[in-house]
Every structure is written in C-alpha cells, then in structure tokens.
C-alpha cells in the first residue's frame, strides 16, 4: 500500500522540489503552505508521516502539532524542519512528541534516509542477536511479545537512539498526560531486564538515553 506523506512548507520552490523527489521514490505527497490550511486538511485526512516546517504563516507548526494531537488524537510520526538555530525550539518539539528533525538546508538523500526509518518493514537490529519488529522482541532466538506501552517506549527510544530524552517528552508521547515517575521507571525497568541494564542510561534530573552497545 502506498505511503501517504503530508508536507507543510511555505517555500513554494522547496515544497515542489521535495514533493517531486518523494513521489519519484513512490510516496503519495500532499502539500500545504500555511498552518491554517494544514490544520483543515489534517482534520479530515490521515497520513503515514508529517513533514512540518516550523516557521510558516497563520499558525506555526508547533502550535499546529499540539492542536491536531489534542483535537483529533493524531499520533502520526512527525519530522520537524527548521532553519532556526534554537535548541529551545527543538526541545519544545520533542516535548510535544516529535519523532525527528531536519535543519535547513538539508540534503534530499538525508531526508530519504530519515523517512525510511519510519517505513522500514525489516526487523531492527538493536544489538547483536537482539531484533525488534512490530511489537515483537527477539532475544537470541527467543521471541517476546511486548505490551503496547512497552513497545511504544522502545520504538520512541529507537527513534531517538543516542539522544537524551526528557521524562516529560516520554510522558507526552506515550501517555499525553502527567504520570507518576514510578510508572515510567517501571517500563524502563522492563526494557532493561530484556535488553540489559546498561542499554538505557539515567541522566539524573534530565531524562534517559537509549544507548545499546
């Protein structure tokens, strides 16, 4: 089935270039040029991936993403595109549940690689002899079906491997509400038991980093 990608970009030439490139790769691409237009389209149609330029007219993409999550319970992966050299903006994006980001100017081959991470149907090798595929963890040949929240947590860590992720970002992405710290620690403990205690680092007062050896 053809994957559908939604692109929000107010630079018409860049939008057309990205659209043409992605269509050549076999994706179905829909474009919007401002936040209001994007909101209206996303209110009636679902996509497999969102590419959102942060600074667009009428409603910036951070506000757009927050609204579509709250109004339509959309959990589609989103890659933010930004020309801003502003770590606070990126932090806000990840706190909202962003899956990834690209900084302008970006290479189209890099964009392709980022997108394929979300559409790859092959098992992901987490570390030697440990694979993950569609809620199933294979550890040295032994298969373990992960509960939905545990699987979502692992997938979020895989998307942000090597990055420090705040507890708030994990809460927003997986529960979309405040939870007890003990709840998150329980899920972390389950993954550590399956993958090894050193695969998830705790950065006290900051968050966690998934760093499998």
From Swiss-Prot:
A molecular-function term among this protein's GO annotations: transcription cis-regulatory region binding
Keyword list, A-Z: DNA-binding, Phosphoprotein, Transcription, Transcription regulation, Two-component regulatory system
PROSITE patterns given in the database record: OMPR_PHOB, RESPONSE_REGULATORY
Residues in Response regulatory domain copies: 4-119
PTM summary: Phosphorylated by CrdS.
Changes seen on gene knockout: Deletion mutant is not able to colonize the stomach in mice. Also shows a significant loss of viability upon exposure to nitric oxide.
Chain residues forming the annotated DNA-binding region: 121-212
GO annotation terms (biological process): regulation of DNA-templated transcription
Modified residues (4-aspartylphosphate): 53
Superkingdom of the source species: Bacteria
Function: Member of the two-component regulatory system CrdR/CrdS that induces the transcriptional induction of the copper resistance determinant CrdA. Upon phosphorylation by CrdS, functions as a transcriptional regulator by direct binding to promoter regions of target genes including the crdA promoter or nitric oxide-responsive gene promoters.
Record GO cellular component, one term: cytosol
Gene3D superfamilies xref list: 3.40.50.2300, Winged helix-like DNA-binding domain superfamily/Winged helix DNA-binding domain
Protein name stated in the entry: Transcriptional regulatory protein CrdR
Classification via PANTHER family: DNA-BINDING DUAL MASTER TRANSCRIPTIONAL REGULATOR RPAA, REGULATOR OF RPOS
One Pfam family per UniProt: Response_reg
SUPFAM superfamilies: C-terminal effector domain of the bipartite response regulators, CheY-like
């Amino acid at each position: 089935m053809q994957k559908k990608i939604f692109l929000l970009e107010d630079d018409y030439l860049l939008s057309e270039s990205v659209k043409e490139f992605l269509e050549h790769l076999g994706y179905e691409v829909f474009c919007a040029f401002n936040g209001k237009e994007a909101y209206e389209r996303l209110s009636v149609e679902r996509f497999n991936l969102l590419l959102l330029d942060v600074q667009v007219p009428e409603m910036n993409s951070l506000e757009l993403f927050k609204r579509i999550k709250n109004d339509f319970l959309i959990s589609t992966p989103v890659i933010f595109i930004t020309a801003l050299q502003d770590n606070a903006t990126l932090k806000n994006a990840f706190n909202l549940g962003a899956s990834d980001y690209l900084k302008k100017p970006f290479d189209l081959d890099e964009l392709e690689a980022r997108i394929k991470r979300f559409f790859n149907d092959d098992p992901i090798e987490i570390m030697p002899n440990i694979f993950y595929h569609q809620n199933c963890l294979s550890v040295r040949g032994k298969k373990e079906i992960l509960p939905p929240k545990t699987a979502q947590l692992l997938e979020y860590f895989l998307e942000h491997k090597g990055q420090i992720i705040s507890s708030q970002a994990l809460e927003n992405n997986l529960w979309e509400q405040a939870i007890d710290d003990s709840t998150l620690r329980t899920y972390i403990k389950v993954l550590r038991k399956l993958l090894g205690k050193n695969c998830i680092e705790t950065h006290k007062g900051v968050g966690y980093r998934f760093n499998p050896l």
